Protein backbone atom coordinates (compact mmCIF):
# COMPACT_ATOMS: atom_id res chain seq x y z
CA UNK A 1 0.00 0.00 0.00
CA UNK A 2 1.79 3.12 -1.16
CA UNK A 3 0.39 4.55 -4.40
CA UNK A 4 -2.86 6.43 -4.93
CA UNK A 5 -5.09 4.55 -7.38
CA UNK A 6 -8.27 6.65 -7.33
CA UNK A 7 -9.56 10.07 -6.26
CA UNK A 8 -13.00 11.34 -5.32
CA UNK A 9 -14.12 14.96 -5.48
CA UNK A 10 -17.14 15.60 -3.28
CA UNK A 11 -19.60 18.16 -4.64
CA UNK A 12 -22.83 19.80 -3.50
CA UNK A 13 -23.89 20.00 -7.17
CA UNK A 14 -22.40 17.03 -9.06
CA UNK A 15 -23.58 18.20 -12.49
CA UNK A 16 -22.04 21.64 -11.97
CA UNK A 17 -18.75 20.09 -10.80
CA UNK A 18 -18.63 17.71 -13.78
CA UNK A 19 -19.23 20.63 -16.15
CA UNK A 20 -16.47 22.65 -14.48
CA UNK A 21 -13.83 19.90 -14.64
CA UNK A 22 -14.78 18.98 -18.21
CA UNK A 23 -14.32 22.62 -19.26
CA UNK A 24 -11.07 23.09 -17.33
CA UNK A 25 -9.31 19.73 -17.85
CA UNK A 26 -11.28 18.01 -20.62
CA UNK A 27 -12.38 15.19 -18.30
CA UNK A 28 -15.02 12.72 -19.51
CA UNK A 29 -17.37 10.70 -17.32
CA UNK A 30 -19.13 7.39 -16.87
CA UNK A 31 -22.37 7.44 -14.87
CA UNK A 32 -22.01 4.97 -11.98
CA UNK A 33 -25.02 6.34 -10.07
CA UNK A 34 -26.98 3.07 -10.17
CA UNK A 35 -24.00 1.10 -8.85
CA UNK A 36 -23.14 3.61 -6.11
CA UNK A 37 -26.71 4.36 -5.04
CA UNK A 38 -26.04 8.13 -5.20
CA UNK A 39 -24.90 10.60 -7.87
CA UNK A 40 -21.44 9.23 -8.73
CA UNK A 41 -19.63 9.88 -12.00
CA UNK A 42 -16.40 8.05 -12.86
CA UNK A 43 -13.75 10.46 -14.13
CA UNK A 44 -11.55 9.57 -17.08
CA UNK A 45 -8.82 12.14 -16.51
CA UNK A 46 -6.84 11.40 -19.65
CA UNK A 47 -5.56 8.74 -22.03
CA UNK A 48 -4.48 5.44 -20.44
CA UNK A 49 -1.02 5.78 -22.03
CA UNK A 50 -0.29 8.95 -20.03
CA UNK A 51 0.67 9.15 -16.33
CA UNK A 52 -2.12 9.84 -13.85
CA UNK A 53 -5.09 8.24 -12.14
CA UNK A 54 -8.81 8.26 -12.75
CA UNK A 55 -11.38 9.00 -10.10
CA UNK A 56 -14.92 10.20 -9.52
CA UNK A 57 -17.09 13.19 -8.76
CA UNK A 58 -19.71 12.26 -6.21
CA UNK A 59 -22.52 13.77 -4.16
CA UNK A 60 -21.23 15.34 -0.94
CA UNK A 61 -22.85 13.68 2.04
CA UNK A 62 -24.78 15.80 4.50
CA UNK A 63 -23.12 17.26 7.61
CA UNK A 64 -20.90 20.07 8.80
CA UNK A 65 -17.25 19.03 8.97
CA UNK A 66 -14.96 16.10 8.26
CA UNK A 67 -14.85 13.39 10.90
CA UNK A 68 -16.24 9.93 11.60
CA UNK A 69 -19.73 9.80 10.10
CA UNK A 70 -19.46 13.33 8.65
CA UNK A 71 -19.01 14.52 5.05
CA UNK A 72 -15.86 15.27 3.14
CA UNK A 73 -15.36 18.82 1.93
CA UNK A 74 -12.61 18.27 -0.60
CA UNK A 75 -10.92 15.50 -2.54
CA UNK A 76 -10.10 12.03 -1.27
CA UNK A 77 -7.21 9.86 -2.44
CA UNK A 78 -7.79 6.13 -2.33
CA UNK A 79 -4.84 3.82 -1.80
CA UNK A 80 -4.68 0.38 -3.40
CA UNK A 81 -3.86 -2.71 -1.34
CA UNK A 82 -3.58 -6.45 -1.81
CA UNK A 83 -4.43 -7.11 1.87
CA UNK A 84 -7.11 -4.84 3.32
CA UNK A 85 -7.06 -6.32 6.82
CA UNK A 86 -3.27 -6.07 7.16
CA UNK A 87 -3.27 -2.43 6.07
CA UNK A 88 -6.27 -1.63 8.28
CA UNK A 89 -4.25 -2.86 11.28
CA UNK A 90 -1.23 -0.78 10.19
CA UNK A 91 -3.36 2.36 9.83
CA UNK A 92 -4.97 1.96 13.27
CA UNK A 93 -1.63 1.13 14.94
CA UNK A 94 -0.13 4.32 13.47
CA UNK A 95 -2.92 6.45 14.98
CA UNK A 96 -5.45 6.47 12.13
CA UNK A 97 -9.17 6.15 12.79
CA UNK A 98 -11.93 4.42 10.85
CA UNK A 99 -14.16 7.03 9.18
CA UNK A 100 -16.35 4.54 7.27
CA UNK A 101 -15.78 0.82 7.88
CA UNK A 102 -14.78 -1.76 5.31
CA UNK A 103 -17.66 -2.55 2.97
CA UNK A 104 -18.12 -4.66 -0.14
CA UNK A 105 -18.48 -3.09 -3.54
CA UNK A 106 -20.23 -6.24 -4.80
CA UNK A 107 -18.29 -8.06 -7.48
CA UNK A 108 -15.55 -5.43 -7.48
CA UNK A 109 -13.67 -4.74 -4.24
CA UNK A 110 -13.52 -4.00 -0.53
CA UNK A 111 -13.50 -0.29 0.31
CA UNK A 112 -13.22 1.74 3.51
CA UNK A 113 -12.25 5.22 4.63
CA UNK A 114 -9.93 6.45 7.37
CA UNK A 115 -8.86 9.64 9.11
CA UNK A 116 -5.14 10.29 9.35
CA UNK A 117 -3.61 11.88 12.46
CA UNK A 118 -4.48 15.34 11.08
CA UNK A 119 -8.14 14.60 10.36
CA UNK A 120 -7.69 14.11 6.60
CA UNK A 121 -9.80 11.40 4.97
CA UNK A 122 -8.32 8.74 2.69
CA UNK A 123 -9.67 5.53 1.22
CA UNK A 124 -8.38 1.96 1.16
CA UNK A 125 -9.37 -0.31 -1.76
CA UNK A 126 -8.69 -4.02 -2.27
CA UNK A 127 -9.86 -5.42 -5.61
CA UNK A 128 -11.85 -8.64 -5.14
CA UNK A 129 -14.31 -9.93 -7.75
CA UNK A 130 -15.88 -12.08 -5.00
CA UNK A 131 -16.62 -9.19 -2.62
CA UNK A 132 -20.21 -9.39 -1.43
List PLM regions with ranges.
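N-terminal beta-strand motif that seeds the catalytic metal site of vicinal oxygen chelate
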Residues: 1-19, 74-79, 126-132
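Short connector loops at helix/strand junctions that flank enzyme active sites
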Residues: 2, 50-52, 70-74
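Core segments of cupin and vicinal oxygen chelate
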Residues: 8-52
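Vicinal oxygen chelate
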Residues: 9, 30-32, 88-132
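Short beta-strand micro-motifs in enzyme catalytic cores
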Residues: 39-41, 75, 108-112
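A short, structured beta-strand/loop element
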Residues: 52-59
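A short, acidic/glycine-rich surface segment
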Residues: 59-67, 132
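Mid-chain, well-packed structural core segment of small domains
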Residues: 65-94
